Amino acid sequence: MGREIITLQAGQCGNQIGSQFWQQLCLEHGIGPDGTLESFATEGVDRKDVFFYQSDDTRYIPRAILIDLEPRVVNNILSDTYGSLYNPENILITKNGGGAGNNWANGYSHAERIFEDIMDMIDREADGSDSLEGFSLLHSIAGGTGSGLGSFLLERLNDRYPKKIIQTYSVFPNSQSVSDVVVQPYNSLLALKRLTLNADSVVVLDNAALAHIAADRLHTQNPTFHQQNQLVSTVMSASTTTLRYPGYMNNDLVSIIASLIPSPRCHFLLTSYTPFTNQQVEEAKAIRKTTVLDVMRRLLLPKNQMVSVNPSKKSCFISILDIIQGEADPADVHKSLLRIRERRYASFIPWGPASIQVALSKKSPYIKTNHRVSGLMLANHTSIASLFKRTLDQYDRLRKRNAFLEQYKKEAIFEDDLNEFDSSRDVVADLINEYEACEDPNYLSL
């Protein structure tokens, strides 16, 4: 029986990666662009109902809600090949459509004004589920809508559905290059507070690493956002394969999260994927032979990680879950795990087991790939704190000069004082300390 997941897409980035995610799922499940099941899709071993429901005319419709404060991106999606896939009642674009002006406070205030409409959609989707497991939020934390409206959604979902899991796929800005959004550190910090306090699990995707991986695989200096989003949709579909092609383990969100997050604060996950194939990213470099060991070893290489972190000497894994798709023999997996342990490819926390968990999953029978095995690693690693430190440093530099604060003071949340900034900074500083404490052998007795 499917445990359903409702996907919430907020802002430009959230809707763009969401659009490619749904295209990927349709291809994997043999669903046509208008939601009808293709005539060849007769295998019947998959659970489509986790992410789709069937309408009265038997079309498959995504359990998705598309929200944006300016219409361009959503209108592009609706006029595209897959435009008729979505339920039109689940699309919310604000009437005047001016966007949030890359301002967290603007996005947050906007969300308060349209809160009833958003909640009506969410409640309707939740009521239409037999056994709702949780929500998946797709957004970026640098702009206005994804960070501000996304933050508001996280808080309200937590209040309204306290027992449901909230997972996010959060795109972090490229902090290594000059941004076109000068207030990005403010937006990121304010959103990070909500990701820390109101989400159960955050899959961190970072534009710098995505651009680097796309450039490396495609031999191109400047990969487009479309190509980077394809990497994201590949990661998202791979991270949900065990839900859609269930096996004995990891066939619901709660079991995946339980194996990865031993202490609730440290719930920010990084991902690696290998190999990217021609179908997923055109003209990608082909890897000639894929064995289970080869895939598991490659997943541990920093260059395949979708987050650019600065590990210190003490940085270590808290936990790892490898999802291996394709023809994998459990005996090979066991041998590979022994080899990885012998060769010390990965260093783990000193106070817990050195556990790499492996979930074997089927591949979609409808997509032909030129390799036997592919793998996704979801990992909890203490070096993720370096990403938060970067955000904090950039925030401190802006805040010291009180730069660009006037835009924020126009909104109700900052009208009287700037306490919200200070409390967000405290939460993120505590989060960094928590990850650093994990590197201490005495963590459990601290």
Swiss-Prot record:
Transmembrane segments: none annotated. GO terms for biological process: cytoplasmic microtubule organization; meiotic spindle organization; microtubule nucleation; mitotic cell cycle; mitotic cytokinesis, division site positioning; mitotic sister chromatid segregation; mitotic spindle midzone assembly; mitotic spindle organization. GTP binds at A142, G143, G144, T145, G146, S147, G148. Keywords: Cytoplasm, Cytoskeleton, GTP-binding, Microtubule, Nucleotide-binding. Disulfide bonds: none annotated. One of its GO terms (cellular component) is old mitotic spindle pole body. It is found in: Cytoplasm, Cytoskeleton, Microtubule organizing center, Spindle pole body. PROSITE patterns: TUBULIN (PS00227). One of its GO terms (molecular function) is GTP binding. It holds the Pfam family Tubulin_C. Its main location: cytoplasm. Belongs to the tubulin family. PANTHER family: TUBULIN (PTHR11588). Interacts with mto1. Interacts with mto2. Tubulin is the major constituent of microtubules. The gamma chain is found at microtubule organizing centers (MTOC) such as the spindle poles or the centrosome, suggesting that it is involved in the minus-end nucleation of microtubule assembly. This is Tubulin gamma chain.
